[in-house]
Amino acid sequence: MKTSQNLVSVEQFSNQDVMAYLKLAQAFKNGKTVQLSQPTFAMNLFFENSTRTHTSFEMAERRLGLQVIPFDPKTSSVTKGESLLDTLKTIEAIGVNLAVVRHPRDRYYQPLLDAGFDMSLINAGDGSGQHPSQSLLDMLTIYEEFGHFDGLKIAIVGDLAHSRVARSNMALLTQLGAQVYFGGPKEWYGRDFEAYGEYQTMDQLVATMDVMMLLRVQHERLSQVNNQTFDASAYHQQYGLTAERAARMPKHAIIMHPAPVNRGVELASDLVEAPQSRIFQQMTNGVYIRMAMVASVLAHQGLISATQVEV
């Protein structure tokens, strides 16, 4: 596979790259192992709260044999005003080989790439911008279900305006040949989404989609913008995947959600564990996709031989 020193955006991925990551992730899922050429160190720097992404990156790193150095922004020199650039320069000087960063600022990574590092950087989410590891694990989940992307009808529904998952997935799904549709509050369907797919109501979407991908309503970002209040019950009735709507989905269709799930808001609580739900499979796949991403950047550094990431 083509290796990269840094993985920050789905814009880096050709279709061939995507399939290489999916195949390598499947190999790890089936028990593949790799050998590091020397002791290798990772640090996960999360400036936003996270359960799935943070934990699965650490699980991926440990499964690959890396030593994970803990980092807590609340007890770091960031609280003294140290910049993100200087923080990363510091950990590189100390000997860290891989930094995985989540940050609330869109494209936080650009000044870091411009500065240049020998260590690798993986973007674990930037503001409302990009979330490449989530996008790849979603591609893996869809590929495991259908075996292809071409012509699949996939609805992305919910808080589009604030979602890095929506932006990453709409670009990658369209590139791979899927047909993307959008749903949710119409005011969140902006011009940047119009180029990728049309808007439909929930009742229109559930009748024809192969995948219903629900997005969390991001209360924390809504309140930051304009102190909006939110009526969860009204949202669920108008834009949520209710049990009645789920019953009208095609028999082969699946439900996805990047989580955390607001049960009873984006979808009815019972649907989270329903037979057509792939939500927990997405979480499982997250470990193996992140193993593939970490292995790729380490192979670029020569810390894993290139032959070990070929499948």
Swiss-Prot record:
The reaction(s) this protein catalyses: carbamoyl phosphate + L-aspartate = N-carbamoyl-L-aspartate + phosphate + H(+)
Record carries keyword Transferase: yes
Binding positions for carbamoyl phosphate per the UniProt entry: R52, T53, R102, H131, Q134, A259, P260
Pfam families named in the record: OTCace, OTCace_N
A GO CC term assigned to this protein in UniProt: cytosol
InterPro entries: Asp/Orn_carbamoyltranf_P-bd, Asp/Orn_carbamoylTrfase, Asp/Orn_carbamoylTrfase_sf, Asp_carbamoyltransf, Asp_carbamoyltransf_Asp/Orn-bd
Enzyme Commission number(s): 2.1.3.2
Keyword Transferase recorded: yes
Record keywords: Pyrimidine biosynthesis, Transferase
Pathway: Pyrimidine metabolism; UMP biosynthesis via de novo pathway; (S)-dihydroorotate from bicarbonate: step 2/3
Alphabetized PROSITE patterns for the sequence: CARBAMOYLTRANSFERASE
Binding site for L-aspartate: K80, R164, R216
GO biological process: 'de novo' pyrimidine nucleobase biosynthetic process; 'de novo' UMP biosynthetic process; amino acid metabolic process
Enzyme class: transferase
Annotated GO MF terms: amino acid binding; aspartate carbamoyltransferase activity
Assembly behavior: Heterododecamer (2C3:3R2) of six catalytic PyrB chains organized as two trimers (C3), and six regulatory PyrI chains organized as three dimers (R2).
Purpose of the protein: Catalyzes the condensation of carbamoyl phosphate and aspartate to form carbamoyl aspartate and inorganic phosphate, the committed step in the de novo pyrimidine nucleotide biosynthesis pathway.
Family: Belongs to the aspartate/ornithine carbamoyltransferase superfamily. ATCase family.
Protein name per the record: Aspartate carbamoyltransferase catalytic subunit
